[in-house]
């Protein structure tokens, strides 16, 4: 599962939010920044690492604001 997306929503560089234990989030190929933003079934648009962040990652929420490649 992807847990919750509170971490990304508020832009906190945390862990165990979107993707952790599910799609990975930061560095894993499917995490936020290297593929599908949070990958929580929705808002999977890639974010932060070369893709932007708010604009692509679910209307400003999903992967922080400014960067979505938190490890």
Swiss-Prot record:
Organism: Homo sapiens (Human)
Superkingdom as given in the UniProt entry: Eukaryota
Record family assignment: Belongs to the KRTAP type 6 family.
The protein's assembly and partners: Interacts with hair keratins.
GO biological process terms, semicolon-separated: keratinization
GO cellular component, one term: cytosol
This protein's name: Keratin-associated protein 6-1
Role, per record: In the hair cortex, hair keratin intermediate filaments are embedded in an interfilamentous matrix, consisting of hair keratin-associated proteins (KRTAP), which are essential for the formation of a rigid and resistant hair shaft through their extensive disulfide bond cross-linking with abundant cysteine residues of hair keratins. The matrix proteins include the high-sulfur and high-glycine-tyrosine keratins.
Disulfide bonds: none
InterPro entries referenced in this protein's UniProt entry, alphabetically: KAP6
Keyword annotations of the record: Keratin, Repeat
């Amino acid at each position: 599962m992807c847990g919750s997306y509170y971490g990304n929503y508020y832009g906190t560089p945390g862990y165990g939010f979107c993707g952790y234990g599910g799609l990975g989030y930061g560095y894993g190929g499917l995490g936020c920044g290297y593929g599908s933003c949070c990958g929580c079934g929705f808002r999977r648009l890639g974010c932060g690492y070369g893709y932007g962040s708010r604009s692509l990652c679910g209307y400003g929420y999903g992967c922080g604001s400014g960067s979505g490649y938190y490890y």
